[in-house]
């Protein structure tokens, strides 16, 4: 199983002036420790319901990922996940393509339909749910159109692009790998089957009942659209407990793998600390050796 970290909280105790050095140290330790990808939340406001009143620092996702690209050489880089209506589709595709080019082919495009709270507070665009899913499908189709060099205009259900050029293209042939976040059975998992290289589900504490069910639904969608289910990376967002040991977390990864997951994307209460990151990298080595 692959193991990655997700940065959801930037409120380290030494404040914003040290954020750059904190991120450099975090990225170096993650890369040296063998983690697969650094994910960052694509939020403008703190979205962790467990964050304290003083933990409000949040950085823009693609600026942060571009900064991390310049301080690392191997580890993957992605947003977990971008609300589809916050950026114009062509701009989002250009941003992730630029990240892929400048990182030497290490970017992920992580996208989802978005949710109301943050958009309402910051007056961000948030069309009705059905329109957002249409826009998500159009954006994924547009990315494929641009990354494969298809000629001519693009016309989707909600989106028309007269001249969808994307030069330079991504480093990897076929484009940047796509992760669609969310577990909605009718539309989200259908879009995974149609367009994505990975899904992202949530680690519900019910002994795998929900996760196995969601994967069964994804398999049905794959069968319906003629997609190879095995070709989709099954990621799961899960939390490393404050006192959890490497052995304990590796055991949880083994259970997740037994339920059909292949990639653990790990968050932690509060900002990442050196101790918690060391626990995670130790667990990643145990999982790799299993």
Where are these regions (language model features)?
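Flexible, glycine-rich active-site loops centered on histidine and acidic residues
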Residues: 2-18, 84-153, 202, 271
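Hydrophobic faces of well-ordered beta-strands that scaffold small-molecule active sites
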Residues: 3-7, 38-40, 76-79, 107-111, ...
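Active-site mouth loops of central-metabolism enzymes
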Residues: 7-21, 80-90, 173-184, 236-247
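Short, acidic/polar
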Residues: 17-30, 92-95, 181-194, 244-257
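Conserved, mostly hydrophobic/aromatic
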Residues: 30, 34, 42, 68, ...
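C-terminal helical cap(s) of enzyme catalytic domains, especially alpha/beta-barrels
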Residues: 128, 132, 136-144, 208-218, ...
């Amino acid at each position: 199983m692959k193991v990655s970290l997700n940065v959801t909280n930037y409120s380290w105790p030494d404040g914003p002036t040290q954020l750059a050095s904190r991120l450099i140290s975090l990225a170096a330790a993650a890369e040296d420790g063998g983690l697969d990808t650094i994910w960052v939340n694509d939020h403008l406001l703190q979205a962790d319901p467990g964050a304290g009143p003083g933990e409000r620092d949040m950085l823009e996702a693609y600026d942060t990922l571009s900064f991390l690209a310049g301080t690392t050489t191997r580890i993957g880089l992605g947003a977990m996940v971008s609300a589809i209506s916050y950026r114009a589709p062509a701009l989002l595709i250009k941003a992730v393509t630029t990240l892929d080019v400048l990182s030497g082919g290490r970017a992920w495009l992580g996208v989802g339909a978005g949710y109301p709270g943050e958009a309402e507070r910051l007056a961000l665009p948030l069309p009705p749910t059905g329109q957002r899913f249409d826009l998500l499908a159009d954006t994924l189709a547009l990315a494929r159109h641009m990354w494969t060099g298809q000629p001519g205009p693009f016309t989707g259900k909600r989106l028309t692009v007269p001249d969808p050029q994307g030069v330079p293209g991504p480093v990897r042939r076929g484009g940047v790998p796509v992760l669609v976040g969310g577990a909605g059975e009718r539309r989200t998992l259908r879009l995974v089957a149609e367009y994505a290289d990975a899904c992202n589900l949530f680690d519900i504490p019910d002994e795998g009942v929900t996760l196995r069910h969601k994967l069964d639904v994804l398999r049905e969608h794959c069968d319906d659209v003629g997609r190879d289910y095995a070709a989709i990376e099954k990621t799961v967002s899960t939390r490393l407990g404050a006192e959890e040991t490497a052995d304990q977390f590796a055991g949880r990864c083994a259970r997740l793998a037994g339920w059909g997951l292949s990639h653990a994307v790990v968050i932690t209460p509060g900002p990442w600390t050196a101790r918690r990151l060391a626990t995670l990298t130790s667990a990643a080595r145990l999982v790799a050796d299993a």
